[in-house]
Amino acid sequence: MTSTPTELIRNFSIIAHIDHGKSTLADRLIQTTGALSAREMTEQVLDNMDIEKERGITIKAQTVRLNYKAKDGKTYVLNLMDTPGHVDFAYEVSRSLAACEGSLLVVDASQGVEAQTLANVYQAIDANHEIVPVLNKIDLPAAEPERVKQQIEDVIGLDASDAVEISAKTGLNIEAVLEALVTRLPPPKGDETAPLKAMLVDSWYDSYLGVIILVRVRDGRLRKGQRVRMMSTGAVHTIDQVGTFSPKLTPQADLGPGEIGYITAAIKTVADCNVGDTITDDRAPATEPLPGFKPSIPVVWCGLYPVDADDFEKLRDSLAKLRLNDASFHYEAETSAALGFGFRCGFLGLLHLEIIQERLSREFDLDLIATAPSVVYRLYKTSGEMMELHNPADMPDGSVIDHIEEPWIRATIMVPDDYLGAVLTLCNERRGQQVDLTYVGNRAMAVYRLPLNEVVFDFYDRLKSVSRGYASFDYQMDDYVEGDLVKISILVNQEPVDALAFIAHRSVADTRGRAICAKLKDLIPRQLFKIAIQAAIGGRVIARETLGALSKDVTAKCYGGDISRKRKLLEKQKEGKKRMRQFGKVEIPQTAFLAALKMDA
């Protein structure tokens, strides 16, 4: 089969806030163009991870090729890239957008524009996309299409007068969306005779085929048996299979300019496939790679340890397999005195961390402990040397530190004005600095600069609870700012517990220290001797709780008789306890770790 001429191809992605009906619209487009038979249609076809279906969110970007016979009688090939809407997966979004020429902007006609819609639209505008606004859920009684169109124009600055009004659930007006794609989006550009340049959009692991690579061809052709080279790593592979998604893998003879498809090349490790890399022909390589690719930088780090130490190897293999699918996730081995062997893992954000943890426990059946999430600090020593600090336990002695810088973010929060006061109070409690506050209709848009350290723990949950779930939140990294930060160590029976150490601003150090000590007092089982649970900054103890001893009734078998007999036994017990306190080891149960780490917020 010869590849499709470029003027009949349209590559587009769907951008939307969480829950505005993006995956449902994708389902309808697949159904209308008949890419899957009625028997194979399931809800959210493109969300193929269980977690994605359960939480109703899209995590991995997915693609599908649709054939559509338009009103002008020509049959067009539409390549749909379904992108995630959540802020943590902005990296997946940026790659999908780089592979397309246009976007459908889906906005819920009853909710209006939300924070993540904005973030993704700006990314699409940066990628020079033609954007077609689509109002979804028009069948709801609460839908206000005119108000939302006005809002799109006011907030984003897009002309929404000819926005397509649809209901993805009932399938209303889906044809109009397909026509808009064909008439309003530009075809891809590309030169078939130039040296091969293809962008590696995503890669995942298949136990039969090895690594499957999702590619977007810019120039040249990709065909079976061709030897290709990855430009960033220099690895050379021979292509076994070329094809497209419908959403099932469908082999083709070759892929030409503008087409999106997959290749397999018996690649064993995904480490060879850097997402966003340029693939070129080994014999006639392109001179320079495609622009528009930035490697992802982890923002949040935490330690992952197996509950059962024997599972360490299993955890290592599982992480390696996940890394195959998720290029934005990093890990390195580390050890902890309290938790044994484990890994220090880097994530794009908290939802990303939660999902990786959940995938490890589901797909690989692992029981894990995660230490408190921390951000990357920059530590400047008195010697003038700068080190990056991923783990609070590695922080050197205070005397050698000149100053510490912490990452700040720029957060955009959209909230109905009834809840604005509570949201502003929350931001101020978290050391936020207000940058901007504007009103659009009855919704306020607040822009704040916040230290990432304060956001990492539970900012998102608190934001949702103070705004009754109406606020939406999006952020991008700003820069590093010097801060008065201290490391708080937790000591149990005079022994520091490395897994519980954390870094906080001096102003909140005391309250956090007290809270953790009080929590641990309830969680650690009582021993036969008294235990002190302390929080300390350097050598200064800032909080203490004492866990009382269990006492065994040693005088139980003395009946009556002389008091000195009882006293002798009690003295003996006291001696023993004193000795135990000196040499006794306190085992902290795993449940205590989990609960203490959860409450760090």
UniProtKB/Swiss-Prot annotation:
GO terms for molecular function: GTP binding; GTPase activity; guanosine tetraphosphate binding; ribosome binding; translation elongation factor activity. It is found in: Cell inner membrane. It is an enzyme of class 3 (hydrolase). It is a peripheral membrane protein. Gene3D superfamilies: 3.30.70.240, Elongation factor 4, C-terminal domain, Elongation Factor G (Translational Gtpase), domain 3, P-loop containing nucleotide triphosphate hydrolases, Translation factors. The keyword Hydrolase applies. GO terms for biological process: positive regulation of translation. Pfam families: EFG_C (PF00679), GTP_EFTU (PF00009), GTP_EFTU_D2 (PF03144), LepA_C (PF06421). Belongs to the TRAFAC class translation factor GTPase superfamily. Classic translation factor GTPase family. LepA subfamily. This is Elongation factor 4. The gene is lepA.
